[in-house]
């Protein structure tokens, strides 16, 4: 059967105060919501002056292998950190994500899990790049079973192995969930609220563009006179569908609303529209009168 979580929380002074929810402590697939941890790590690097928004990243064959949804660039082309971050959030660009992880280093993402309040950073250590996770989940050879039963050390070896071979998607598994084998990025509804709150706190000084990056695509139609700011990140992989919003109402009260759904087989396309209707109803319930 399906597993799911849902949470509505107020954010006060950077802390999440749950108002309603189900299974809010359960670790479930994040799909592309994991990219919020990459953005949080990037914001920290920008604050500490180790990375600048204007730094250029060079497109590699490996980063292109995971697909791009907005940066149709050839190998060797260069893209700024700022543009990569914008695309990673707005169009969930996988190539941009891996270029940023490569620039920051996976250690920085693992540290970001901790500083953003993830309940179990060890569960995402070693932190897989998209190339690595796609290789484990959907590539040849099939490494899913190996991954499922592997210790942290063995998982690190598996990730090294995927990096030494070209990613070849296995068409027979293209639509089968890898989350059944633990090949996903994981977090709870509580974690999702905390990383949204962390990103809001990040968005000051040199890292202030984070606020605009998060809100470029609201991902939901709400009355903007009631909800003047809507930051959003959603995700979808076979069997996994996730939504999250950091929205500020007209009184200035921030809210985080999230949904995570997980099925043992691929879900159809209709469920997305249905979930967005549910989300709109939730926002209607919490909107100031």
PLM region spans:
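Acidic-enriched, low-complexity/disordered segments with a strong bias for Aspartate over Glutamate
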Residues: 12, 17, 54-55, 93, ...
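General structural signal for secondary-structure boundaries
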Residues: 54-56, 60, 80-81, 126-130, ...
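Short charge-dense sequence patches
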Residues: 37, 56-67, 139-149, 159-167, ...
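Low-complexity, flexible helical/coil segments
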Residues: 41-47, 95, 124-126, 135-137, ...
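Active-site-adjacent loops and short helices of periplasmic peptidoglycan-processing enzymes
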Residues: 1-128, 133
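Structured C-terminal helix/loop/strand segments within mature extracytoplasmic catalytic/sensor domains
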Residues: 170-289
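Mid-domain, small-residue-enriched loop/turn segments at the edges of structured enzyme/sensor domains
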Residues: 3-4, 91, 97-196
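Charged, low-complexity, helix/coiled-coil-prone segments
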Residues: 25-33, 41-58, 131-142, 153-158, ...
């Amino acid at each position: 059967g399906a597993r799911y979580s849902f949470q509505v929380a107020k954010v006060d002074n950077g802390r999440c105060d749950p108002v309603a929810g189900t299974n809010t402590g359960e670790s479930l697939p994040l799909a592309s919501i994991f990219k919020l941890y990459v953005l949080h790590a990037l914001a920290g690097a920008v604050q500490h002056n180790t990375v600048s928004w204007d730094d250029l990243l060079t497109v590699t064959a490996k980063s292109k292998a995971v697909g791009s949804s907005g940066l149709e660039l050839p190998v060797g082309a260069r893209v700024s950190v700022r543009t990569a971050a914008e695309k990673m959030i707005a169009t969930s660009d996988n190539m941009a994500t891996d270029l940023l992880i490569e620039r920051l280093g996976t250690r920085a993402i693992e540290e970001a899990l901790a500083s953003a309040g993830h309940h179990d950073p060890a569960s995402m250590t070693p932190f897989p790049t998209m190339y690595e996770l796609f290789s484990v989940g959907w590539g040849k050879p099939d490494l899913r079973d190996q991954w499922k039963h592997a210790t942290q050390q063995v998982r690190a070896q598996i990730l090294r192995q995927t990096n030494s071979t070209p990613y070849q998607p296995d068409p027979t598994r293209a639509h089968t969930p890898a989350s059944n084998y633990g090949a996903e990025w994981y977090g709870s509804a509580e974690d999702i609220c905390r990383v949204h709150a962390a990103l809001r706190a990040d968005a000051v000084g040199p890292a202030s563009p984070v606020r605009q990056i998060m809100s470029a695509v609201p991902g939901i139609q709400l009355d903007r006179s009631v909800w003047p700011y809507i930051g959003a990140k959603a995700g979808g992989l076979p069997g996994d569908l996730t939504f999250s919003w950091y929205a500020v109402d007209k009184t200035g009260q921030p809210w985080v609303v999230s949904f995570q759904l997980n099925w043992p087989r691929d879900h159809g396309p209709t469920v997305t529209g249905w979930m967005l209707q549910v989300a709109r109803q939730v926002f209607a319930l919490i909107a100031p009168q």
